[in-house]
UniProtKB/Swiss-Prot annotation:
It comes from Phaeosphaeria nodorum (strain SN15 / ATCC MYA-4574 / FGSC 10173) (Glume blotch fungus). Keywords: Membrane, Mitochondrion, Mitochondrion inner membrane, Repeat, Transmembrane, Transmembrane helix, Transport. This is Mitochondrial thiamine pyrophosphate carrier 1. Mitochondrial transporter that mediates uptake of thiamine pyrophosphate (ThPP) into mitochondria. It comes from the Eukaryota. Belongs to the mitochondrial carrier (TC 2.A.29) family. It is found in: Mitochondrion inner membrane. The chain crosses the membrane at residues 17-38, 91-107, 127-147, 182-199, 213-231, 286-303. GO terms for biological process: thiamine pyrophosphate transmembrane transport. The keyword RNA-binding does not apply. It is a multi-pass membrane protein. Gene3D superfamilies: Mitochondrial carrier domain. One of its GO terms (molecular function) is thiamine transmembrane transporter activity.
Length: 321
C-alpha cells in the first residue's frame, strides 16, 4: 500500500460513510440512467437478430445494439423514455450506496480484529468485505431494484402508472414474495461482483496514485473504479441477465416492451433455458452497454465518495481547530 493512500475502512466516521455513500449513489444514478434503461431493454430481448424468423410478426420493438436501441427509444418514447424508472432507481442508489459503504467499512474493521496467525491478507479482507456489503445492500434494496427494472421495461403500454400503483398491484397480485423475484440471482451475482470490485479497487488505488502520469482532481480513484468494474462485471454478467428475466415475471409479463418473455422459475432453470434457446449471446446480451454503464458509474461513484468524504473530513478538522 502506497504511503498516504488510505483504504476505505480507514476513512471517516460511520455517519460520514453513510452520507458519502448516499451522495455517490445519487450522482452516479443520474449520470448513467439512460444506459441503464438501454441495458435492461437488451437483456429482456430474447429473439436472435441473426434469425429474422424469431421476431417476425412480433408485436413489439426489435433492438439492434446500443446505438440502435437508443435511437429507437428516442423515436418511440421520447427523451423521457431514457429515464423510465428513475425515481425508484434514485431511491435504490441512495439507499444502496449508504448500506454498501457502511457494511463494507464495518465488516472490514471486524475482520481486522482476527488475531494472528489467522489474520487475513488485505486482498482477502477486501473481497470478503465487498461480498458481504453487496449481499446486505442488495437484500435491503431489492424491492426498489425490481421496481426500477419493471418501469424501465415498460413501453408505450404503461403497466404501472406510478410507484404507489406498482406497489399496490404487486402486493395484491403477487404477494410479498413478488417484491423479491430474482433475489437469489441478484445475491449470487453481487457477492462475487462486489468482492472482486472492492478487492481490485483497493489494490489499484495506490497504484493509480503513484502513476507517473498526472491524474488531476483525484481521478486516480475514478480510473481504479473503472478497471475494477470492467473486470468484475464481465465475470458475473450471465447472473445479471438471469436476475432481470426473473424480475419481470408475474401476471404482467406479456405487457412489457418485449411481449414474448418466457416463463422462468428459479435461477438454475432460467440459466439453462437461456443457454439452450439463446446460447452464449443470450447470456451476454447487453454486455457492451452494461460495461459502458458500469465503467462510468463506478468511476463517478468512487470519485464522488472519495471527494465527499474528503470534504467532510476537512470540515471536521477545521471545526476542531
Amino acid at each position: 500500500m502506497s504511503e498516504g493512500v488510505a483504504q476505505l475502512k480507514h476513512e471517516g466516521s460511520r455517519q460520514q460513510v453513510v452520507v458519502a455513500g448516499a451522495a455517490a449513489g445519487l450522482v452516479s444514478r443520474f449520470v448513467i440512467a439512460p444506459l441503464d434503461v438501454i441495458k435492461i431493454r437488451l437483456q429482456l430481448q430474447i429473439h436472435s437478430l441473426s434469425e429474422p424468423t424469431s421476431y417476425r410478426g412480433l408485436n413489439g420493438p426489435v433492438y439492434k445494439g446500443t446505438l440502435g436501441t437508443l435511437k429507437q427509444i428516442l423515436r418511440d418514447e421520447g427523451v423521457t423514455g431514457l429515464w423510465k424508472g428513475n425515481i425508484p432507481a434514485e431511491l435504490l442508489y441512495l439507499t444502496y450506496g449508504s448500506v454498501q459503504f457502511s457494511a463494507y467499512t464495518n465488516i472490514s474493521q471486524m475482520l481486522d480484529t482476527i488475531p494472528a496467525p489467522y489474520t487475513l491478507p488485505s486482498s482477502a479482507n477486501s473481497f470478503i468485505s465487498g461480498a458481504g456489503a453487496g449481499a446486505a445492500a442488495t437484500t435491503v434494496t431489492y424491492p426498489l431494484d425490481l421496481l426500477r427494472t419493471r418501469f424501465a421495461a415498460q413501453g408505450k403500454d404503461r403497466v404501472y402508472t406510478s410507484i404507489v400503483a406498482s406497489l399496490k398491484s404487486i402486493a395484491q397480485h403477487e404477494g410479498p414474495t413478488g417484491f423479491f423475484r430474482g433475489l437469489g440471482a441478484g445475491v449470487s451475482q453481487i457477492v462475487p461482483y462486489m468482492g472482486l470490485f472492492f478487492a481490485s479497487y483497493e489494490s489499484l488505488k495506490p497504484v493509480m496514485a503513484d502513476s507517473p502520469l498526472p491524474l488531476p482532481l483525484g481521478s486516480s480513484d475514478a480510473v481504479a473504479g473503472v478497471v475494477a468494474s470492467v473486470v468484475s462485471k464481465t465475470a458475473v454478467y450471465p447472473l445479471d441477465t438471469t436476475r432481470k428475466r426473473l424480475q419481470v415475471q408475474g401476471p404482467n409479463r406479456a405487457r412489457y416492451v418485449h411481449r414474448n418473455i418466457p416463463t422462468y422459475s428459479g435461477v438454475l432453470m432460467t440459466l439453462q433455458h437461456i443457454w439452450k434457446h439463446e446460447g452464449r449471446r443470450g447470456m451476454y446480451r447487453g454486455l457492451t452497454v452494461s460495461l459502458l454503464k458500469a465503467a462510468p458509474a463506478s468511476a463517478v461513484t468512487m470519485w464522488t465518495y472519495e471527494r465527499a468524504m474528503g470534504i467532510m473530513v476537512a470540515f471536521e478538522k477545521d471545526g476542531m481547530e
